[in-house]
Amino acid sequence: SIYYKFTYDVPDEMAAKGYVTVEKGSVTVNGVSLTVCNSERRSFRVAIIPYTYEHTNFHAIEPGTEVNIEFDIIGKYLARLAEFSR
């Protein structure tokens, strides 16, 4: 199937506050809830199907475009729990 991949860098101040993504977890980008297909320490990738690409503003996003990102709170809690269990 055809889909689009978007990779986003997590800003340092957000990473420092414990905002993280987990693979198969969710993240909201510009108001669109998406599934994370790849998660790194400071970046994550989402795959967007053609319908979503065409019916949202993703078709207008270019490299370097600022977007609104809302992280899944469960990922933040899991990261915090892992920190305390060390």
Regions found by a protein language model. Give the residues of each.
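Conserved loop->alpha-helix
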Residues: 1-86
